[in-house]
């Protein structure tokens, strides 16, 4: 399997403060890698390194030539006095064709929002629009920084199902930052626990038993993870209702 991005022994220092130390990772097509860690662990800094927004102080980064990246930021700040529809917001992205906007919104089940004001969107609707915008350049790598921030629990479930669906359909790599331990871990292939350095990494069921993971999130967090992965035999619709994968039936 080819590698889209490779980080080799990356460190980042701001002044006298070391934010990241000796980070190595690879991002591959069709795989979801989730970054977990406490506030101040360096997760957003690592995302910016992957995006090429900041250069590492030491170490090397190799990107696939011509790599197309779609990015969903942690927060979007809009002037509430500026009238801006979803359609207009989508067209602010350089190189976007008007004909591409509706298909992108349909892909994330948000076509009905096309003419809605951005300022009137709910948290979940806002994230779907940002995700649609990130898909406009047919990304090989999708980078999601806290994609469910400000979204209610039902909306979080639906968004994670959507991200997994997009990964399957597009075959893209996904780098995701999250705090939603028991939800996101059921949807990821690999976990990297970060606290300036890599505390542990690997498949969720392996990481959940690692001493440093337990020290970071507690035994209860590890138990929640194990139970959730074992029983997660369903997906969720846009309202968070359960749809069993083997029957198509719904539950409350």
From Swiss-Prot:
GO terms for molecular function: ABC-type zinc transporter activity; ATP binding; ATP hydrolysis activity. InterPro entries: AAA+_ATPase (IPR003593), ABC_transporter-like_ATP-bd (IPR003439), Metal_Ion_Import_ABC (IPR050153), P-loop_NTPase (IPR027417). GO terms for biological process: response to zinc ion. SMART domains: AAA (SM00382). It comes from the Bacteria. PROSITE patterns: ABC_TRANSPORTER_2 (PS50893), ZNUC (PS51298). Keywords: ATP-binding, Cell inner membrane, Cell membrane, Ion transport, Membrane, Nucleotide-binding, Translocase, Transport, Zinc, Zinc transport. Its main location: membrane. It is an enzyme of class 7 (translocase). Belongs to the ABC transporter superfamily. Zinc importer (TC 3.A.1.15.5) family. This is Zinc import ATP-binding protein ZnuC.
């Amino acid at each position: 399997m080819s590698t889209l991005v490779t980080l080799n022994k990356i460190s980042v220092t701001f002044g006298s403060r070391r934010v990241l130390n000796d980070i190595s990772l690879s991002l591959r097509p069709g795989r979801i890698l989730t970054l977990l860690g406490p506030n101040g662990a360096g997760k957003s800094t690592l995302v910016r390194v992957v995006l090429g927004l900041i250069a590492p102080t030491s170490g090397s980064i190799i990107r696939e030539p011509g790599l197309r990246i779609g990015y969903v930021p942690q927060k979007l700040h809009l002037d509430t006095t500026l009238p801006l529809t979803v359609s207009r917001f989508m067209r602010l992205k350089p190189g976007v064709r008007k004909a591409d906007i509706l298909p992108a919104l349909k892909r994330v089940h948000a076509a009905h929002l096309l003419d809605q004001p951005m300022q009137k969107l709910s948290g979940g609707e806002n994230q779907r629009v940002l995700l649609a915008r990130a898909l406009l350049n047919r990304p090989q790598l999708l980078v999601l920084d806290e994609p469910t921030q400000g979204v209610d629990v039902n909306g979080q479930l639906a968004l994670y199902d959507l991200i997994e669906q997009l990964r399957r359909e597009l075959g893209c790599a996904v780098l995701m930052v999250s705090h939603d331990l028991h939800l996101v871990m059921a949807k990821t292939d690999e976990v990297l626990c970060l606290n300036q350095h890599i505390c542990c990494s690997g498949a969720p069921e392996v990481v959940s038993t690692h001493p440093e993971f337990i020290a970071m999130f507690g035994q209860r967090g590890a138990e929640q993870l194990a139970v959730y992965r074992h029983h997660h035999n369903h997906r969720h619709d846009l309202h968070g209702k359960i749809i069993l994968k083997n029957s198509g039936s719904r539950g409350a």
